[in-house]
Amino acid sequence: MATDGASCEPDLSRAPEDAAGAAAEAAKKEFDVDTLSKSELRMLLSVMEGELEARDLVIEALRARRKEVFIQERYGRFNLNDPFLALQRDYEAGAGDKEKKPVCTNPLSILEAVMAHCRKMQERMSAQLAAAESRQKKLEMEKLQLQALEQEHKKLATRLEEERGKNKQVVLMLVKECKQLSGKVIEEAQKLEDVMAKLEEEKKKTNELEEELCAEKRRSTEMEAQMEKQLSEFDTEREQLRAKLNREEAHTTDLKEEIDKMKKMIEQLKRGSDSKPSLSLPRKTKDRRLVSISVGTEGTVTRSVACQTDLVTESADHVKKLPLTMPVKPSTGSPLASANAKGSVCTSAAMARPGIDRQASHGDLIGVSVPAFPPSSASRIEENGPSTGSTPDPTSSTPPLPSNAAPPTAQTPGITPQNSQAPPMHSLHSPCANASLHPGLNPRIQAARFRFQGNANDPDQNGNTTQSPPSRDVSPTSRDNLVAKQLARNTVTQALSRFTGPQAGAPPRPGAPPAGDVGTHPSVGRTSVKTHGVARVDRGNPPPIPPKKPGLSQTPSPPHPQLKVIIDSSRASNTGAKGDNKTVASPPSSLPQGNRVINEENLPKSSSPQLPPKPSIDLTVAPAGCAVSALATSQVGAWPAATPGLNQPACSDSSLVIPTTIAFCSSINPVSASSCRPGASDSLLVTASGWSPSLTPLLMSGGPAPLAGRPTLLQQAAAQGNVTLLSMLLNEEGLDINYSCEDGHSALYSAAKNGHTDCVRLLLSAEAQVNAADKNGFTPLCAAAAQGHFKCVELLIAYDANINHAADGGQTPLYLACKNGNKECIKLLLEAGTDRSVKTTDGWTPVHAAVDTGNVDSLKLLMYHRVPAHGNSFSEEESESGVFDLDGGEESPEGKSKPVVTADLINHANREGWTAAHIAASKGFKNCLEILCRHGGLETERRDKCNRTVHDVATDDCKHLLENLNALKIPLRISVGEIEPSNYGSDDFECENTICALNIRKQTSWDDFSKAVSQALTNHFQAISSDGWWSLEDVTCNNTTDSNIGLSARSIRSITLGNVPWSVGQSFAQSPWDFMMKNKAEHITVLLSGPQEGCLSSVTYASMIPLQMMQNYLRLVEQYHNVIFHGPEGSLQDYIVHQLALCLKHRQMAAGFSCEIVRAEVDAGFSKKQLLDLFISSACLIPVKQSPVKKKIIIILENLEKSSLSELLRDFLAPLENRSTESPCTFQKGNGMSECYYFHENCFLMGTIAKACLQGSDLLVQQHFRWVQLRWDAEPMQGLLQRFLRRKVVNKFRGQVPPPCDPVCKTVDWALSVWRQLNSCLARLGTPEALLGPKYFLSCPVVPGHAQVTVKWMSKLWNGVITPRVQEAILSRASVKRQPGFGQTTAKRHPSQGQQAVVKAALSILLNKAVLHGCPLPRAELEQHTADFKGGSFPLSIVSSYNSCSKKKGESGAWRRVNTSPRRKSSRFSLPTWNKPDLSNEGIKNKTLSQLNCNRNASLSKQKSLENDVSLTLNLDQRLSLGSDDEADLVKELQSMCSSKSESDISKIADSRDDLRMFDSSGNHPVFSATINNLRMPVSQKEVCPLSSHQTTECSNSKSKTELGVSRVKSFLPVPRSKVTQCSQNTKRSSSSSNTRQIEINNNSKEEN
């Protein structure tokens, strides 16, 4: 159409488009019609249609006038009458187009110009339309997003409500369950008390029965002793009669023989032969027989000890037990009885004292018994005792002695026994004494074994085993006549008879046991030789108590002589008595070693042939040690385990141990710990009688045991530890004690190797060669050190053994001790001054040996043990326990002590080139390698002969150790820069905190170092912000907060290595290890970004407020300009505001603006005029005529709670909200002139209020500011204290987090719980002005191991801060008249006695529930500190009486009705009261509860007051008159808080009587022992939703029953445990019959901002 028509015309005037047209064309090309909506397309179509119509109209009009205009334009000026005009026309027509110029304007050009203009306008309109469409599109998109967000918000709100409902149900259910469980706990506690009472009664009865049983046992023992005494007397009398009968029979026989001889003599006389010689022969024979077979019953009266009631130990043994005879009272001036006398050596006991308990063994009465050899006519078996008489027994005609051996006589000179102190001792058996019987042994041998052990484990007549009962107080000569001694003597008799003469061809006599059993179960014969001058003892002296019966006397045994037995070379049976008095507690060094007492008196020679010389017995009283049984010490040899080297027993191939059962009561245990191994001996009699397994079958074969020479016997005795036999052999003359066997082992070597200390002592005292070496060059000291027998080593060193003797292979005693890991031997050798540097032929040192076995203790001794000063070895040993503690860390003394060994010894290489470090590293002994590495001179780079270093041969663990050998441990610290002065609340913040120690090795690169620093920081931030060891749960807030505080490695501003700055990722030419060593960097400091850089990372780390919240606070200040921070006192408002101001200042300065911070402290006298001057002087408030300033002003108003916000800021609210010249405000200056001012945009105003919530007229200011509330139960305050104390603990432990069981963690948890519980209780009391922020608890001391410091700090905090605030808050609430002043209630200057009682009750409850509960100190220690806490000794009886006694006198039958007098409405902003409902419809519930309270008050009034304060000792009338409405309401709240467990904040208090500690002076108030003692049942009540503080209290009279309140549990004060059941029943009855609702108005509502 118009466009087409226009396009048909020639485009003569179209010129190229300019830049604007090109831009429009480009915008048009970018315009996309496809993206337009339908409405937009319609609008676009309508616009374009209008443009087209306009163009068409213009074109049509121009066409209509085209011709006329053309003619008029072209020819209008010409006239036909003018020829010049025609010429001009011809000229124009004839000239060319380029040469001719138009005479007039061409209309087509005008049209084209118009069309071009329209086209440009069209493009411009299209661009504007596209922009409008894009804006419209964005608007629609934002609307859609807003709708989606609104829908999502609604869904979340709905879900939140559902979750709240569910949580509410769960909480109610948990509360109900807690109450049920509390009831069950009380019931179980009551049951437990009953059971414990019954248990105590049963214990008393049991004790009484035990005492009666002990009395019965004593009586039975006495009766048994009497019976034994009578039986012994009867046996003695019977034996005497039998002896007399035997004498008579013998005498009759002699007479008959004499008659026969006389008859023969008569016949010979008749024959005429000479009868004189024949007369003398019978006389000699008679004399000889009288001497040999007669029994001297007249000289020495003997008595039997054996009891007829004793059981036979083995049924297969048909030989009855034989009695033991003894002389009762030998005369001191006459010779001792030889055959029946017992040689006794009673040694000292190591661990006994006179008067020891009844379990003492009878071993104190057992000495060394050397029996005489019985003649043939005196060896007879009797059931109740051996017969004594002059007639030989026809059944025992064969003597056990050789036929040529005459019966020995006993003509001994008189020896006065020496009395020696012999206290009772415990008898200990050898290790194998309790082994089970071997089934292959002869029953007789088994019976003999039990007989040898009968001193401690023999069964009595009732089959019971008595554990070594104490012996009776008997005469000195009769105390050692025991059955076991008789058995031992006969065993020695039979064994020694084999040593001294042949027995071949001697058949056993009939009725006697076989010869093979002689040594193990001998037949005890009586060999009594007549002596002269011994007085007869009367029968009234009681015999000794048998060893199987408990003694009657509890007094210590009197001294009796210790007998030393000597057998003379004349073979006479001599038993001399000689005593060796030794001190009981004398150390080994104080005793004479190897003393021998030998009787050298000449004995009358017998007319019988002489026997070979018999060895005399040398008995030395052993030093202090383990008291061993008399029958168990003759053989102590348990065989050591067979190990290579020096561990083979000496002469073990031909070892024959001679069975000598001479009773030797030693006071030490010769068996060392290293040689006593279980199962070392497989013979039952080795430990009991000294027999070796190879000897047993020889003794059972009936013939004599084949014996080697005396030197070999000496070695065998020394190897087996047979002290008795060894002492006998050492007393022989001409015996070579230094004789060596084939292996070169001497007797001393064998004894030292097997650890027989007594044998070593005997040999050394006998002057054995101490340095005699075997064929391999090992000395006794080498053997003892190798086997670990440190007592033998000590003895050998004392006898000047060569401690540096080297064997053929170069092994020294120290080397052998280190090789076998014998720590005690090493210590003894080192203290003796041995050389540590002696090397073997292979080049090994003792250090090599110790490391080769991996023995850490041996290596420590070698490296650090110093030779002690003379006389101080004991103290050195005691102090060594902590010197070598590898785990000591920084406190280990090993780090302070220097090694003793030199670097040459540590680095010494063996034949293969290996040092001790090579050996330890190759075997993986990391501990040994670590000890070696501590030596400063260790060369870890030394190579062996294969060119390998220690690192090359090391295991993986040891390689890691070597790599960290020279690592530098440099502490890493975090610094937050300079802390501002303490008036900003930052006095408890620390500038620097050590978080860890970095290990920098030689091969550490800078990349590794950067990663280590970053990882250490990340780990530290996560550690302090996580809930790792915090076991405390949040008891006030259910929402979970982000534990991360927002710090990371990106928060670092700079890092300094010592004094050199460094950044993460930066590298130097030197390695980190070289760099640290060169610059001597002692620490690495990380500086966090702070306000100076416009960041808040350092503020976050210093205050533990999450970084995200601090950034949010800064955004609010920048956006709204007017922000006030408010919260409880101590919530760090001032610190937060100041740090935000610093950060904002540096940000503005970085942007190019000048900035200034103006700080003003507001007090009660701070006026509005002063504030106006502050605003004007700081250029924050400028006149309207003045132009705005570019300077940024930050004003901080602190402590606004001290002034009235409405009065102070009322005139500034509108200008602050609308900062422009359009809303000015007129202020009057001091000169009376008024001027208009306004706040400019570059002014920031921040304020702080130390108040939990606003009240009264201050609420009018709320809408004009942006408020940031710092609640104690929400972030950031909720977790701030937890994070701060956790960082404090981590810093105290040098970057380590202690385990939860650590006392420091428990102390910190307690401090945190005190703050939470305290605020929770104060919030429940409705006293928000007393709430505390975490600032006061930031100074909690963290002292490991000293929880008392924290308790003392808590007492100071309680007395100085908490108590005054609580007291002021309670008094302000309990006061009758409220002052609406500044939103705070003030108490009266002189509170009444009732108000004082309420305050002290509140303090007592808070102290017990919030502070003392959960204290980590034990109860005893805590009670010592409770006196430091004020207000903890208030009697709760006063509080409990308020429930019923604070009402008016006229209202005795019901609860106090609500008072709606006009005084309750005196002020609009007065605090709401806790009203009671109208009681017109009271039921049984009120009467029941009232009666219950009256009964309880009556019982509690009997209790004494817990304080002497006159103001607290109130009588009932005073309480009735003092209680106001507010006081009663507060008391009821205290009452509910004291007893209720339904609140979430106190639900964690344990149900135990120790949790609520009531402190009184008398301790006679069980009614206040615990709050859980009373059993509660919930009473359903309905409450009104808590009203905000600015609402009036008139709603208490109206019937507004919004059912949004939470049901509460009716509770009472604690009652005694005895009244629990009654209270619970009354509560149930009252709760079941009441419809009363308690409407309660809580003024502690939370403000919604």
From Swiss-Prot:
This is Cortactin-binding protein 2. The lineage of its organism: Eukaryota, Metazoa, Chordata, Craniata, Vertebrata. It comes from Aotus nancymaae (Ma's night monkey). ANK repeats lie at residues 709-739, 743-772, 776-805, 809-838, 842-871, 912-942. Residues 119-276 form a coiled coil. GO terms for molecular function: protein phosphatase 2A binding. Residues 411-422, 583-593, 1639-1649 have a biased composition (Polar residues). Residues 368-379, 386-396, 1624-1638 have a biased composition (Low complexity). Keywords: ANK repeat, Cell projection, Coiled coil, Cytoplasm, Methylation, Phosphoprotein, Repeat, Synapse. Interacts with CTTN/cortactin SH3 domain. Interacts with STRN, STRN4/zinedin and MOB4/phocein; this interactions mediate the association with the STRIPAK core complex and may regulate dendritic spine distribution of the STRIPAK complex in hippocampal neurons. Activation of glutamate receptors weakens the interaction with STRN and STRN4. The modification Asymmetric dimethylarginine is found at R498. InterPro entries: Ankyrin_rpt (IPR002110), Ankyrin_rpt-contain_sf (IPR036770), Cortactin-Actin_Reg (IPR050719), Cortactin-binding_p2_N (IPR019131).
